[in-house]
Structure formats: C-alpha cells, structure tokens
Amino acid sequence: MEIKSRDKLEPGDVLAKPIYNSNGVALLPAGAVLSESNIDRLRKDYNDISEFFCVDTPGTENIIIEDNIGEEVRIKTSIAIRNKQIREIIEQSKVISHQIINYNIHDVDFYDTRNKSDYVTRHAVNVAIVSCIIAKSMGYSEKELEEITLAGLLHDFARSNQSDSNIEKLYTDRLKCKKEEILPYLTVDLLKDTDFVRTGEISQNVLSSILCHHEHQNGQGYYKVPAEIIKKHKYASILHVADIYDTLSNNDTKSILIDLPENALYLFNRSGGMTPKNIITYFMKDYGAVSESQRLFDPTVVKHFIKCVSIYSKGRRVKLSNGDIAVVNRNFLGHSDRPEVVVIDGTLKGKTINLTENVNYLNLSVIDYVHDEKDYKLKM
C-alpha cells in the first residue's frame, strides 16, 4: 500500500484502510474501489476527512503502513478535546504514552490524517505524540512521558474551549497582546482551578510547560522569558519544538499562529515551501552555528528531535537521484534521509533497496517527494 493525497486519487484505486470522518464514522470501507464519482465527492463534499489515504497500488503490496498511534485512539482523543472532556483527555494521554513505550515507538513518522474541520484537535494529538517520542529519546521516565503527553494534548485547550473572536474579546484589551500570545495564558487560566489540578492529575509541571511553550531559547518569545527560567518549566522546550514542527507541517498556512523569524520564512520561500526536508533543515540551522541571541530552541531537544523525525514518511512516493520512482517502505533511526524504498518505476523497478545499509547503492539517494502529476500515472 501507499499514501496518496486527495488530489492524486485515481479511478480504480483500492482503499487499503477505511475513510473516517472526524466523528469516527466510516464513510468508505477498506477494499472499496474508488470511482470518479467517489473521488469527486471526496474532493468537494467532505471537509471533515483526511487529506491523505492509504491505497493498494501495483508494486506496493508488501508495504504495510501503520501510524505510530492508531486511528481509533486519535479519533477518540480528538473527540475528547473537542468536547472538553478533561477526564477522558487525561486517560488518553496515558494510552498514547503507554503505546509509545510498549510498542517501542522511537520515530516521528506518521502521515497527517488531520482535516480542515478539526485542525485544533489533530494538532494537539500530533504535538503530544511528537513531544512524547522526543522525551522518550531523552530518557524521561514513564510518569514524565505521561505528563508531557498530557501537556501536549492540553497545550491549546483554550482554542478548543472558546472561539477565536471570544478569546480576543476577553483578553486582548486586558493583556494588550496578540491572540497567539494569550492562548497559553488562557489555557492555564481555564485549567488551574479545576479538580484535576487540585488532585494532582494535572500537575504544576504540565501547567507551567503549557504557559511557556511559546518561549524561545534566546528570551525573545511571547513573554520574553529568559532561557534559564524556561529550563525550570520541565517540558516547555520539548513542547516548543513539537508545536512548531507540527504547525509547519500543516498545509493550511493560515492556521500558523507562530511568528516565524525572517530567516525561516526566507528558507521556506526560496527552497520550495514547507516540505519535511526543509523543516528539518530549519531546525538543524538553529541547532548549528548560531549565536545564543539567535537561537530559538533548546539544542539538546533539537538534537533528539532530528534523530527521531523521518524526513520521508512511510508509504509516500519519492523520486530517486537516478530518476526512478519509489515508495518509502521503512525508516531508520538517525538516518532519516536514507530510508528503505520499493522501486515501482524505472531501471530498478521491483527492487527493495535499503539506502542506509546496502553498500551497492551508496550513490543512490532520495531527492524529494513526487509532486509531478505524470509520475502518478505510471505504466505498471
């Protein structure tokens, strides 16, 4: 199977997994053969479904795509966030962190199942997963992984709790600041007097990290908190990286609330937009030779993030340096730019090649995801 975006679907494509709406209702089952009318409806009529789908195509039969966290857990957690069910959010934070621990999930490699109607909730789930994986790489305990997962799920709780216009009405005049600056403040305001805080189910570590997750390492974040203070807020620096990573990964750039520095915007505009490769390059530049006055992220967090994140997601179609077209089959920790691929068109068609370990293909590399329409109409 491979992952196709909505605009790349073709009549005759066979769904490898069901298509769900944001409430978990299956619209089409696995095994359904897509027709022109199916595809037209998926493109025009459904705003509450994923932008990406798993389909079976010739040559990809042996590729099995499993998201790090199953769709059932994602949907259940998203519904809890949307309905402001804090008890259920706490329970799902344990489910997610335990899956990451027990299934030895160590890489950030999931195709984005987010859709336009539930951006806020899916963003929260993604930030929680990425934060937990980074923290696991850094050696945090099981209890700490539960806490940081919960912090990720709740970090934008105010956005799911109130409309943007109501947030501005309530707080902009009071704090004299932008909406994106007050969201952490408002989230903590909503949570701090609940029984969950009084009983310790939502800890002070969680609250303080939510409050400071927009702070930069150079002290130039929204609240201008110095780095030495941020370090006292246990998970804030991890949430900061995960939050920006997932926001940049979102195709709907209008949803971005983060004021990116000019050098980041320049990088993305000059190098083809916010592709996974460019996003990782952005973090690597911050991790590299920059002065403390320019650094936005904790370098230790970025080091572990870069080790864990996959540049090329499993199941996505990519172009190789020799011109062949392949589908990513597997990623390797610490070698995210050299995955194992299954070649589906070109001189090496039919071969499965481990670009990390196979010494016969040291000169072969992945250039980028396939974007050209003609490469999606291959003669199989």
Go through each PLM region and give its residues.
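Terminal helices and disordered tails flanking the catalytic cores of nucleotide-processing hydrolases
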Residues: 1-94, 107, 253-380
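Short hydrophobic/aromatic segments of transmembrane alpha-helices and their interfaces
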Residues: 22, 142, 229-230
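Hydrophobic transmembrane alpha-helix bundles
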Residues: 50, 119-130, 144-153, 176-193, ...
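Surface-exposed loop/turn and secondary-structure junction residues enriched for glycine/proline
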Residues: 12, 18, 22, 30, ...
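Acidic/His-rich, divalent-metal-binding segments that scaffold phosphate/diphosphate chemistry
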Residues: 53-203
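Alpha-helical scaffolding flanking metal-ion-dependent phosphate/phosphodiester catalytic sites
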Residues: 150-161, 167, 176-189, 193, ...
